Amino acid sequence: MALHFTISEYQQRIKAAIASMQSNNLDGLLMFQQESMYYLTGYDTFGFCFFQCLYLGVDGKLALLTRMADLRQAQHTSVIEDIRIWTDQAGAQPATQLRDMLESLGTRGKRLGIETNSYGLTHFNGKAVDAALDGFCRLTESTNLVNLLRLIKSPAELKYVRKAGALGEEALKAGIRKTKAGADEGDILAAQHAAIFSGGGDYAGNEFIIGSGRDALLGRYKSGRRKLSRRDQLTIELAGVYRHYHVAFMRTIIIGKPSALHIRMDEVCRAALSEVESALQPGKTAGEVFDAHARVMDAHGMQKHRFNACGYSLGAKFTPSWMDFPMLYRGNEVELSAGMVFFTHMILMDSDLGAAFCLGRTYIIGDKMPKPVSRYPLTMIVR
């Protein structure tokens, strides 16, 4: 069995989930987020692109409904013993088979939480679940029940976070070494991924971002590579990943002599990151962290060029995105606590002048000040 934590740790997590269910007057929880399944049981798959659901009752019963293709995946990677299979065939109705499973578990008439805000539950399947369970049980929105438990990492999880950080730093260094005038973006990407995989890491929850020239202003991956010019800018965002735990890095690398605008952007980004770092303390809210970022950016006349969020939590995430709950944006009242992990990104994109500058770092929140997972220097990288 390929478990990455002790049975005791999984039991503690399940116990905490049950306690949260009880405090919310729930008799059970229907999970569609792969992250919840992995956190509570170790179940590791990308099969959530199809219908699957993990049930946890307040009595501790666990049962998974999935496809035959994931039967052995669940057997090999999780503590789940009760695995039910819905049948691939014309006219298949997995939501009805979910109801049958719940009937066998004694949940008729019960109040069940359900994770509706999930890549693992499409609108189509969500409507089918609503129809199948209408009159059978009472459903209540519970997407964040396990999310809130996942926010604070255990010592064992933080060990994986630090390993992911070490892999990410090696990937950053490998990419920098490949960066020079005439270099192909594809070679830079290849070096980054090679560093992670050769170090025992995993695929990331989303593609790495890479873009040069005007495409250095893009905050997402896109298809198509180019070669770097003698004077250029290259924006990269990558994550070291270990046991699905992510530690992200973001930098804009300058090729050739930095422009006066790049120098100014660099100064503003570092000043903003310093303020954000000071705000990453227990008792502060996610919204207050964003406010610290915005104050610095706006005071330097960069409001037009900054983003409306400056980071997000990181943890064990699956495709299509490594961004976790919660995000750092204005008014977000989620309170920070020691043991949380946040990626903070200072992003400036000046479309008028075609200039970009980004500086991103991942922190573990401590009892007072946060600790950067990687201490790679924050000074401008010039190649």
Regions picked out by a protein language model, each given a short descriptive name:
Residues M1-R383:
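Active-site neighborhoods and metal-handling regions in enzymes and metal-associated proteins
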